[in-house]
Amino acid sequence: MRITTVNPYSQEKLGEYEEYDDNRLNGILSGLKEAQREWEKDIDRRIDYFRSVLKPNLSKRRNELAKLITEEMGKPITQSLSEIDKCIKLVDYAINDYPHYLEPQTIKTEGKKTYVRFDPLGTVLLIMPWNFPLWQVMRGAVPAMLAGNAIVLKHASIVTGTSLMIEEIFSSELFRSVIVSGSRVGKLIQKVEGVSLTGSSGAGKSVAQEAGKHLKKVVLELGGSDPFIVLKSANVHEASENAVFARMQNNGQSCIASKRFIVHEDIFEEFADEIAGKFANVKVGDPLDKSTFLGPLSSMDQTKTVRSQIENLSGMGKVSSFGQYSGGIVPPTIAQISGKFEEEVFGPVAILTRFRTDQEAIALANDTPFGLGASIWGHSDEAERIVPEIEAGMVFVNKIVTSDPRVPFGGVKQSGIGRELSKFGTREFTNIKTVWIDH
């Protein structure tokens, strides 16, 4: 099977790649397992690798990789560069902070010595999406490799070139990218010790089912339909300013993008007017132009899906689009509705609805199968009081939801299982081993 990558803005063909056959895959997996046996023995070696190999390689190839990311999946070039810079910061955390999370933890008991150690599992399969093609990989690979695991990456086919460049940047016998179709992922799952998937809820269920057959450890970071709650006490100007990036970052294709804007009725019109004015002034166009804020969606299939969702929203309320459809570009769009819309819209579409009471806002926020992130805007004490009632893995007050190496990332409900980053993510792909020495 041949895989072809296409520029979603120009529709030009970028490259063609051959799928790896079973012999090549088996050779790669055997090499990873052999290398991992030595890798797990020395954390100082692992830290030195991040410091002397991975970080310099990311910096050296920053511009080249950013351009390829933008060409393959349409992200504005300024955001591609920012994504790489964020990955470099993650490596710094892996060098300076994450090793402490892997130190044995002493527990006081009646025995002579009792402690918990964190041993690697072996080889971890990363099944990654196209929307943040470097950050998603780094978020999974760096903590797992620091813990002593090897990594095999199965990336989304539309970013195959990026996947191979990432392998070059890692430049390690502990990290390999493979080109395989989705139908063959099951065979890979059988041959590794852990699986981390970022993708849709449907993909997560399929991978969890396959992993369950073989009792493989899984971490699933899945879809989201994050609420952006604007309380009566909110600074409307601040909230609307942040709403633009919260909804349209990465051309609206982010699992943690704010998608449902739940606004107090007393300030609803003011907020709606402000966000409409800002949406109307967004620079749309060539993602390689540094002044562009909104580029094309990742593929024509994705464009068709979002356009269909906008048509469905038109039957539920007032829909306003600010610009023209052109190729893969979907213009900034606002839908004011009174009912609920359960689908995750992976494009620059803001769904606005109003509420009267805090309990109504909470009910609207939770009325979704997803539970990834949520942001609340208003007086911090008032906002914090409703945090426990929000069904989400992450709640940010007066800040848009983001992934940060210092805090755990992940969701509940249909948004996933497990956590990435921080102490919790670093330990996900470890054998948490109890050691009790009685005398």
Which role does the model predict for each range below?
Residues 1-112:
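N-terminal Rossmann-like NAD(P)+-binding subdomain of aldehyde/semialdehyde dehydrogenases
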Residues 107-238, 355:
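Rossmann-like NAD(P) dinucleotide-binding subdomain of oxidoreductase/dehydrogenase enzymes
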Residues 8, 22-25, 43-44, 62, ...:
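Residues at or immediately preceding the N-termini of alpha-helices
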Residues 10-16, 326-439:
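Conserved C-terminal structural/oligomerization subdomain of aldehyde/semialdehyde dehydrogenase
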Residues 36-40, 58-62, 66, 73, ...:
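Structural signal for hydrophobic packing residues in well-ordered secondary-structure cores
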Residues 15-20, 34-40, 126, 228-230, ...:
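Short, well-ordered beta-strand elements within core beta-sheets of diverse protein domains
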Residues 11, 46, 69, 91, ...:
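Residue-level signal for inorganic ion chemistry
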Residues 1, 14, 194, 202-337, ...:
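ALDH superfamily catalytic-core signature
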